[in-house]
Amino acid sequence: MHSKSFFFPIITILLSFTQNALHTKDEWKSRTIYELLTDRFARTGEDYKTGCDLSNYCGGTFKGIQQHLDYISGMGFNAIWISPIVLNKEGSYHGYHALDLYQINPHYGTAYELKELIRTCHKKDIWVILDAVPNHMAPDVPISSINPFNKDEYYHDYCVIDDENNQEQRENCRLFGLPDLKQEHPFVKEKYLEWIEDIIDDYDFDGVRYADVPYVPKWFWKEFSQAANTYTFGVISSSSSSYIADYQNYMDGVGNYPLFYAMKEGICGGSMKRLENYLFSQHKDYISPKFNVNWLDNHDNARFLNWCNDKRLFRNALIFYFFYEGIPTFYYGDEQYFNGGNDPNNRENMFGFHYSDTDIYKMMKIANEVRRKYKVYDEDLVQRYADDYFYAYTRGNVLIAISNAMNLQRNINYHSFDEGDKLCNKLKEGDCVYVIVGNININMDGEPKIYVKE
């Protein structure tokens, strides 16, 4: 570890931690992630409903998260992805406008409280993901006030990205006008590589998520990932699997935006054949899809229920992506049917909404149990049936069936089960089918099905 100690050195003396056990991508593929915004998930102390200005801080804290870890683990999730932790420009509740890499955002809490959160997570077998943002620093502040990049020479000259297909512009110009760091500058490179290594050591983070990946040179991500020395994944907002797949050469996984777009087009108002087309692209392009991160909702896009106001289709989409190849990430509030639109409306506060009796909460608990018990994450995905209204795939002895229509019946004859095998739907008691003359006859009632071999 480098000589720099973060924030309050005495805290390291006061707290007793086990040595950081860095986790490989193979270890991470068995995990399921609950993504939350630190400012929006839970406040310290009493939990009651209240409104807030979604464009500013609402009051969520590290301690608030800590007090609701049982809510997260009760749903079956064993990893959390929290907001970027460092001091930000005032008003930047989301954490993506860093002002000082060596101070914790006081709105979230103290360095001690962050360490307490992570320590408590580890006691409950919950891993914690650090969100890293080495593309830029805070906008509209004097460069001299930014630590440690307080000189103009640490930034690219001002230019605007007017062509998102121009990689040189992406890497050297300003994303949304944000001061673009010059990663090729020796000081910038050295400080950020030291920072990622030290902050993981000091706080015992288990994995790292990268923001704004295509706006940073690939060679930097390679060195950054080596310094992190744990599981890393990055987000690239593109529908092209061939474009984002190359980034797996520089980090362990990528956020699966192409799958997100395929679900959006195929499940709500389109054809399920769109999912089939994506599967073929995935198998052709990715080094390994099992290390990618999949989601239905996230903090950058309007929620599913905002553009597709159908809870039944929402449940189908959740089960489809959750068992798909990759590490599933569930966005906070989906279990409460949040339906916010574009940023910041998709970043609702969840204060007073930690209900564990909703049907989505219960459904995801079952889904997590099945994924873990049957070690689905080790199995390849095999498509078994696809048409405009129905889609089915297996991973080992688990058969997933979804539909974008209400009532339909399908016979699956391409499968790996034996004659007479009994398959039961874990989401509905008594919903069992048998393999008869090589066929699995499935009757869909509009709800997703998780069949397992009994």
List each language-model region with its residue ranges:
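Substrate-binding/active-site clefts of carbohydrate-active enzymes
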Residues: 24-32, 37-203, 219-234, 241-243
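Bacterial Sec-dependent signal peptides at the C-terminal "C-region" and cleavage site
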Residues: 15-27
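Cleavable N-terminal signal peptides of Sec/SRP-targeted secreted and luminal proteins
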Residues: 7-15
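Bacterial N-terminal signal peptides that target proteins for export
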Residues: 1-7
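Active-site-proximal helices and loops of the catalytic beta/alpha 8
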Residues: 14, 118, 122, 194-295, ...
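Short acidic/histidine-rich active-site segments
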Residues: 331-336
